[in-house]
Amino acid sequence: MRIIFMGTPDFAVPTLEALVAAGHDVVAAYSQPPRPAGRGKKLQPSPVHLAAEAHGIDVRTPVSLKGADEQTTLAAFDADVAVVAAYGLILPQAVLDAPRLGCLNVHGSLLPRWRGAAPVQRAILAGDEMTGVTIMQMERGLDTGPMLARIETPVDGKTAGDLTAELAVKGAALMVQVLADLASYPAVVQPEQGVTYAHKIDKAESRLDFTRDAVDVERQVRAFSPAPGAFFELEGERYRVLAAEVLGVAGEPGVTVDDVLAIACGTGAIRPTLIQRAGRPAMDTASLLRGRAIPGGTRLG
């Protein structure tokens, strides 16, 4: 098939690679424009941009697809289908209608649960036991289109980073499978029951809330690991907690209950197992405490 690919972050790269490996003619790759990154704030192309260039695919990085010129350019690629994975731009109706078979999306949840920008993080925060990937036909609504295929996977205590990587690979394989035999995947309208929305993550959400149950706090850690990183502050310094364990001890929320960084929560406690100080590499908690003692009775913010 002649395919336009549309995606931006690491999550989208396995789908692009799978389409190329399956022998499809990826005639163009659309990705968000390069963004400033690193200490020097040098413009950095997206992961999809770099992957597409490595395959010699024409890359386009418009800031919007609402203009007539961009829509004309896209239509001129004469694609059979557009495959979309975490692109990040709204697709106007003219873009949705341009490919002969429309636009198919790889979405990181079991729709209709967790429509929106942050399905993996929201699934972890909610304590979902299962999540997955849905291949859907795109329409103007936010992840409301009919579904062609789904595949499930257990959350199983995974971090957002681990779960996103797993879903990216599963979604890529499922998209290739669907494109190989579209007739075998009739579109099914999403049910009205069970709809939830995965609102974009606000960085303020990553501050650890020790007034909550320890189980919820540990989910908060996993949902924001590796980025932006759930954190607490001590004496003006930020500590990012990248992994933690739940403990059955009690104390005043936000106060350490021993000398090895067990932190009391509303119910129970957590102990970070992987932690990162500002400007330093991540380390296990024992290594941290060898260089920076945090005695019992210390209040964390």
Swiss-Prot record:
It comes from Novosphingobium aromaticivorans (strain ATCC 700278 / DSM 12444 / CCUG 56034 / CIP 105152 / NBRC 16084 / F199). This is Methionyl-tRNA formyltransferase. Gene3D superfamilies: 3.40.50.12230. GO terms for molecular function: methionyl-tRNA formyltransferase activity. It catalyses: L-methionyl-tRNA(fMet) + (6R)-10-formyltetrahydrofolate = N-formyl-L-methionyl-tRNA(fMet) + (6S)-5,6,7,8-tetrahydrofolate + H(+). Pfam families: Formyl_trans_C, Formyl_trans_N. The gene is fmt. The keyword Translocase does not apply. InterPro entries: Fmt, Formyl_trans_C, Formyl_transf_N, Formyl_transf_N_sf, Formyl_transferase-like_C_sf, Met-tRNA-FMT_C, Met-tRNA-FMT_N. The lineage of its organism: Bacteria, Pseudomonadati, Pseudomonadota, Alphaproteobacteria, Sphingomonadales. Belongs to the Fmt family. Its EC number is 2.1.2.9. Attaches a formyl group to the free amino group of methionyl-tRNA(fMet). The formyl group appears to play a dual role in the initiator identity of N-formylmethionyl-tRNA by promoting its recognition by IF2 and preventing the misappropriation of this tRNA by the elongation apparatus.
